[in-house]
Amino acid sequence: MFLEVADLKDGLWVWKVVFLQVCIEASGWGAEVRDSCGCGDSSSHQTDDPATALALHVACHSFKGQLVQQTLLLGTRPRVWVNNIPQEGPSLPLRQWLLPQCPSLNRSGSAMGTGWGLSGLSPTALSRDGYETETPFSPEGAFPGGGPAEEEGVPRPRAPPEPPDPGAPRPPPDPGPLPLPGSQEKPTFVVQVSTEQLLMSTGGCDKEPPRGQGVDTRGDRTQEGGEKPREQREGPRPEQGPDIPGQQEESPQQEPSSERGDSVGEREARSPGHEGEGGGEWPGISGERRESPGEWGADVPRGRGEGAGEWGSDVPKDRGEGGREWGPEAAQEHGEAARDWTSESPRTLGEDARDWGSSSRDAAGSSPCALRGSLAPERLGDGPWPAWPSPQEREPGPRDRVESPREWGGTESPRGWEAGPREWGPSPGGRGDGPRRRPRKRRGRKGRMGRQLETTATSASATGGPAEEAGASAPEGQAGGGPRGRARGPRQQARRRHGPQRRRGPPQAGEEGPGDATLVLGLGTTSGEQRADQSQTLPALAGAPTAHAHAVPGPGPAAATLGGRGRRGSWRGGRRGGGAGASGGGRGGRGRGRGGRRGSGLSGTREDAGSPSARRGEQRRRGHGPPAAGAAQVSTRGRRARGQRTGEEAQDGLLPRGRDRLPLRPGDSNQRVERPGHPRGGHGAINAPSAPDASPPHHPRRWVSQQRQRLWRQFRVGGGFPPPPPTRPPPVLLPLLRLTCAGDPGASRPGSRRPARRPRGELTPQRPSPFAPQEEGLRAESCVDDGAIAPDTDTASGEVPEAGPSLSSTMCQMGRPRPSPKSPR
């Protein structure tokens, strides 16, 4: 029971006695508590659950100790764990252990003397309560060496309890409310205690609840799920080891309990896959264990069913039943005594299962169960804890190989169970050799950028025909030839990506590249993978100088264009709209092929000058970076080429400017490319940094203006406001509008003149006569009702002509539905 007491009545301290966990093994307590409680408020204690009663009582007494003394310490030596230290009733003065747990100086200043030891607990001096300091329990008083509390009023200074040792294993997490004790003998209120406590408290199994339950087959345990395991947890601790009769005896194989890894840490470390339980406990997984029928027996059902059959008959029952549960024992139980579970993965076990199978224990099956109880809840299959992949799932490795869970995946899979053997990482060989590998992210300068250095002339060839024709001069090609400014080194060039994005290189001369320029360019990719990987490389690679993103691709290490962001490498609009245009603004982002949609006043001629439509020769970029090869549009000749391979033109903006283009910034383009910093020192283009703080502003106000300018530039480049929605001729909109106003989209006649028909059963004022003829619904009526209704139409339809302008559609909404005959349905 956790008793949490916040301000005790006169307590200076708000302390949580979270630790007064009272585990009562005797049953008569409810009554005793009620009787011994003098608080008159016995109704509050009127619960038959002794632990609860005790807690209530204690709370109601502000821990005056009467109760605890009379009750806790009464005849049955209840176990009380305080602060997780199991103590047995009167054998130890409560004060000695309660006190340290609850630091509280009582207000009166007396240390509450040697009151039977709750002195630490009760803010009220015990001596005032009539429990004088001489109590049978400890003449020493709460403070060893202290004698009775010092003169009243002078509390002996007490050090606050030391915080729990961080290294010490924590008590296993509380598994939550115990399920009703199913087959268990009456639940002893067991609280989980950490292994240490158990070690301390139970040297042996003497205090254990009869382990008879140990034999419970798993079924029992599972239904009790939390409780029994808890009990068991409390109970046969592995320390108890074989000596727990019911428990170990059966399994000769059982390892020495010590190995049992019972210390929580050890137990926890064990990979959950501990041996058997894999499948059952982690029901989700069909493991290899399960898979190799031979091993587990062909039939091995997946479920946690009882008995060996579960694992297949050949599996000895022990595995079937309990072993499967991951009792720590079970885990160890296969012969190796000290297998270190942490290092061993279930797979290993998986293989061993056969060995385990041999354990005799299986006959009883019980011990695994019992064990299971003692396992930390993580292992319990039933608990709320997520199942770990079952060991079964792993293919058995050689038995002794120690492997870490990392390896559980296919045996060779470096990445763990998620990936099949070859799933990631470069595969040594050609195309078909494995499941599609994700392109390996290159990290660090050796990855994408460093390569530029190695490629020299090759890059010119690499950048390949179109690139060259696009004016990449070779030197620059080497610097920025690849669209990301990484020259495609010879190796990279060949690197094939089977994914949608084929290569980031400029399209080879004859080759038709992947459809979307963004992919080709490595601009945005759906996964963001490339971009991520570029940005990973950035800082590392670019080195400080280019760290603010305006680095232009250049051969030097500095040349790492950040992530190859294009020359003037700012995210400008995300590489001009790179992936979705940064904030939608990229030039590409706004789909401006041909500038057609730039529907803003800004369109002006800027558009021809700089928009992608102003292609190639006339590239008067007016100082704005390379034309966008945007995600949405790399417009090659002003046509949106979305998804279409837009040949080199798509990229030529990204290719180094050479021959016919004016350099981006005054100065020799190649030279500038090589020295990526801002030409005049200072920051790069204002919008250069991809992250706002990439180039820290030097002046607070400057930052604002930079931002403003950056936003504005994005806006301009991205084409200003999105074009207003096309205006539709009103006749088209009105009927729609009108229907919705009428509130009944199904109304047959859109006219606003009559409110839409309401569903049949609804009460609405109806003019009983004359019903409009049925065909009225079909009658075509002009959608736009100019107000006056031609009476002849109405009379034709049998409707009484109404004078006055018909309500406009809005009026329908405004609640003045005009009464009108409803045609009968």
Swiss-Prot record:
Q: In which tissues is it expressed?
A: Expressed in neurons.
Q: Where is this region: Disordered?
A: 126-825
The UniProt entry's GO CC annotations, sorted and at most eight, read: nucleus
Give the Basic and acidic residues compositional bias ranges.
217-237, 257-277, 315-342, 392-406
**Which segments show compositional bias classed as Low complexity?**
247-256, 455-477, 537-562, 734-750
Subcellular location(s) of the protein: Nucleus
Question: So which domain of life are we looking at?
Answer: Eukaryota
Q: Where is the composition biased (Gly residues)?
A: 576-588
Q: Report biased composition (Polar residues) as residue ranges.
A: 191-200, 524-536
UniProt-recorded Gene Ontology molecular function terms = DNA binding; protein kinase activity
| Biased composition, class Basic residues, residue ranges | 437-449, 485-505, 565-575
Keyword line: DNA-binding, Nucleus
Q: Where is there biased composition of kind Pro residues?
A: 157-180, 721-733
Q: What is its biological role?
A: Might have DNA-binding ability.
Protein name as it appears in the record:
5E5 antigen
State the taxonomy lineage: Eukaryota, Metazoa, Chordata, Craniata, Vertebrata
